[in-house]
Amino acid sequence: MFNSYDDYVAFLATLLDRFVYIQTMEFKVYLTSVTEGYSEGTMRFSHELVLSFNEHIDFAAKRLFKYGYVAYQRGVKLFYYDPQPHPNDPSLASNFPHHKHIHPDLKHHRIPAPEMTFENSNLETVIREIETMILSM
């Protein structure tokens, strides 16, 4: 994980060069306290795919404590990841609280997301998922 604000900003800045299907990327990173930060941004891919993201980072603990990743195509929400707890949904227990919202019924159709973690940024994982979608189009 990232030791500092500067490490995290440097990581975000390299994504555009490391993933060929990202056409443009905009992001902002804010320090919310001496040891915590918040990022928000948008990546645009080919095939009119867009990824909006936010990550809340505790630099002292070297981990995320909240995140959100939302994929769109032509303005239509395709899927999203969040760690909002749903303790009464036993189907999500295997990777609590990490899960993915998918169609049909995007808001209520949730599946476990074992690839998500608080131990590091999940952006590379979601970018690879979008790249796989692009390759299958």
Where are these regions (language model features)?
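UBC/E2-like fold recognition across ubiquitin and ubiquitin-like conjugation systems
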Residues: 1-50, 104, 108-137
